Design a protein with these regions (language model features):
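Membrane-water interface segments at transmembrane-helix boundaries in multipass membrane proteins
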Residues: 106-115, 119-170
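Hydrophobic alpha-helical transmembrane segments of membrane transport/permease proteins
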Residues: 1-39, 132-152
Length: 252
């Protein structure tokens, strides 16, 4: 059970009388036993009624739907960026196994995996927003200006790259392992024995068959990526579900 009560928000207002507090307590159903409150919540949940936010007074379902779009957009952009970075590096790592490309990719994947997202986000903000002043510090659009695609892309760049880094390290290694496994298959050796250029063998035969498990892995990682968006959305003030969750926790 979480500590605190919505009534504490009312009690902070010294002008609220004890009678009004008690009336609100009955209205919210907080006078009922905990098990009654729980089963009431379950019943309302399956009816699509999540109640109203104690913080804003808005229906919770409305807040979720408003935040869902930005979170999906951020996650989609992060997945695209992660694929554009990871798949080429994974391919090169497998192609030049135990050489410079492979060692460099291994170091990069280690750094991407081990660096906390909030730390990377602060570095991005300091470099691109404070020092270089080329990217906005937060939000989804420029405040007080027309909402344009250009403004959206500028605001989307940093949080999507930071979120993508959570996926890049493991995706590089997964692509590399999948490539190496396919490269040992007989049909690859047959293609090489026919004199087909190595680049064509890698792209047409190896990569095409390696992407099947990679796509499956991506499908499993996307829900975790959405969960990891909480910190990223909070740092960049991105108006998604993660920011709503963060604000709700600390308000309560």
């Amino acid at each position: 059970m979480a500590s605190g009560s919505p009534l504490e928000l009312l009690l902070n207002n010294q002008n609220i009388s004890a009678a009004e507090v008690e009336r609100q307590r009955i209205k919210l159903g907080l006078d009922q036993p905990l098990y009654i409150q729980y089963f009431t919540w379950i019943k309302n949940f399956f009816q699509g009624n999540l109640g109203d936010s104690y913080r804003t007074g808005q229906p919770v379902m409305q807040m979720i739907l408003e935040g869902l779009g930005p979170t999906i957009l951020l996650t989609f952009a992060a997945v695209i960026i992660a694929c554009l970075i990871s798949i080429p590096l994974g391919v090169q790592s497998a192609r030049y196994q135990n050489k410079g490309w492979d060692n460099g990719s291994s170091v990069f994947s280690f750094l991407a995996t081990s660096t906390p997202s909030f730390f990377l986000a602060l570095i991005f903000l300091y470099v691109f927003s404070v020092k270089l002043k080329v990217l906005p510090i937060g939000g989804m659009y420029d405040v007080g200006k027309k909402e344009t695609i250009g403004s959206l892309l500028c605001h989307l760049f940093m949080p999507s790259v930071v979120l993508a880094m959570q996926l890049v390290g493991s995706l590089i290694q997964y692509t590399r392992s999948s490539m190496l496994e396919v490269m040992r298959e007989d049909f690859v050796r047959t293609a090489r024995s026919k004199g087909i250029k190595e680049k064509k063998v890698i792209i047409k035969h190896v990569l095409r068959n390696s992407l099947i498990p990679v796509v499956t892995y991506l499908g499993m990682e996307i829900p975790l990526l959405i969960g990891g968006a909480v910190v990223t959305e909070q740092v960049f003030s991105w108006p998604g579900i993660g920011l709503i969750i963060y604000q709700s926790i600390f308000t309560s």
